[in-house]
Design a protein with these regions (language model features):
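Intrinsic-disorder/low-complexity, polar/charged segments
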Residues: 1-2, 143
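Mg2+-dependent prenyl diphosphate-binding active-site environment of isoprenoid biosynthetic enzymes
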Residues: 36-156
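N-terminal amphipathic/basic leader segments beginning at the initiator methionine
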Residues: 2-33
Length: 156
């Protein structure tokens, strides 16, 4: 294969991976919608996650899973999404006035600037909870791997 073909194949793989990650994130957010989810909290959580950055962490997770045989793509995707949600939560908390007091993140106002500090704190916490819910749901078909995965995701 030529260098140009290799580059094109790599870009195609990366595009497919990013699409998979974005679709999975959107799916899990749609799962949250309903009468039991406060709309402003959900909006703040969405604001923290979309639009995303490079999504390097979930891409690395999926790439490692692929290199290891990816025998459970649902679980690998759940882990990738959870890692991104935890990363976004850390950014929300890091942007707060008590830490970096950032005005913007990813080209838009920081969550605390749009929704206020109390809701931003809850949004970051909500993303952490959501991350572990995603992993738990993704591991339903492979529960023997769930404990180790939850531990690995939790350790970062």
């Amino acid at each position: 294969m030529s260098e140009k073909a290799d580059t094109l194949a790599c870009l195609t793989r990366e595009t497919r991976m990013l699409t998979r990650i974005e679709q999975s994130l959107a799916h899990h957010f749609a799962h949250l919608e309903g009468p039991h989810t406060p709309p402003r909290l959900l909006a703040a959580m969405r604001h923290a996650v979309f639009p995303g950055g490079a999504r390097i962490r979930p891409q690395l997770c999926l790439a490692v899973a692929g290199a290891c045989g990816d025998n459970d793509p649902v679980l690998a995707e759940a882990a990738a999404v959870a890692i991104e949600l935890l990363h976004c939560a850390s950014l929300v908390h890091d942007d707060m006035p008590c830490f970096d007091d950032a005005d913007a993140r990813r080209g838009q106002p920081a969550v605390h600037k749009v929704f206020g500090e109390p809701l931003a704190l809850l949004a970051g916490d909500g993303l952490i909870v959501m991350a572990f819910e995603v992993v738990a749901r993704g591991g339903q078909m492979n529960p023997q791997r769930l404990g180790a995965l939850i531990g690995a995701v939790g350790r970062g």
